[in-house]
C-alpha cells in the first residue's frame, strides 16, 4: 500500500510586551515536514509599544516546502500580526474578536504586507514572511502546486504623546 503521514503545522507564538519587543534573531512558526504532506505555517502574534529589529531578524510563519515527495503538496503559509501602540481596550477587542471596530478602530493604521514585494522596510529590517511552501516535486497536468501564501499585518495605534488638534 501507499503510506504517508501528514506533518504538523507551525503552532502559535504569542508575545505580549508592555514595552518594546527587540528581536535581533528568529521567531518562527514554520510548518513541519513528514513522509507525505507538508505542514502549514502557524501563527505569530506580537504586541508591544514598539518593535525593533536588525538585518538578522527573521519572523516567519511559512509553510513547509515539498522537496522530498512526488505525491504531496507544500504547506500553506500561516498568519503574522505585529501590533504597536495599542491601548488595553484595543488589545482586548483584538484578542477576543480578531478585529477592531467603533471607537477602538479610531486612529488605527493596518498595513497589509503579504507577498514578496511588500514594503516591510517601512517597519522593520530583516525578513517578515508567511509565504506558502514551494513545491519542487509534484507536477499535475504540467503545473506545480505550491502552498497558498498566508497573511501578514502590521497594526499601529496612536503613538503616546502630545496631540494638538486645531479647528
Language-model-detected regions and their locations in the chain:
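Glycine-centered low-complexity coil/loop motifs and glycine-rich tracts
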Residues: 1-14, 22-47, 54-85, 92-156
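Enriched but not universal
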Residues: 153, 158-167
Amino acid at each position: 500500500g501507499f503510506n504517508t503521514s501528514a506533518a504538523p503545522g507551525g503552532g502559535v507564538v504569542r508575545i505580549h510586551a508592555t514595552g518594546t519587543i527587540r528581536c535581533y534573531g528568529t521567531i518562527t512558526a514554520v510548518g513541519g515536514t513528514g513522509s507525505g504532506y507538508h505542514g502549514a505555517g502557524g501563527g505569530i502574534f506580537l504586541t508591544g509599544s514598539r518593535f525593533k529589529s536588525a538585518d538578522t531578524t527573521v519572523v516567519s510563519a511559512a509553510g513547509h516546502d515539498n522537496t522530498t515527495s512526488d505525491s504531496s503538496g507544500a504547506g500553506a503559509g500561516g498568519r503574522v500580526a505585529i501590533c504597536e501602540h495599542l491601548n488595553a481596550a484595543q488589545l482586548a477587542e483584538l484578542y477576543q474578536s480578531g478585529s477592531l471596530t467603533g471607537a477602538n478602530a479610531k486612529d488605527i493604521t493596518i498595513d497589509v504586507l503579504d507577498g514578496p514585494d511588500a514594503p516591510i522596510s517601512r517597519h522593520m529590517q530583516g525578513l517578515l514572511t508567511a509565504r506558502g511552501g514551494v513545491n519542487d516535486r509534484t507536477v499535475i497536468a504540467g503545473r506545480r502546486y505550491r502552498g497558498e501564501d498566508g497573511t501578514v499585518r502590521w497594526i499601529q495605534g496612536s503613538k503616546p504623546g502630545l496631540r494638538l488638534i486645531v479647528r
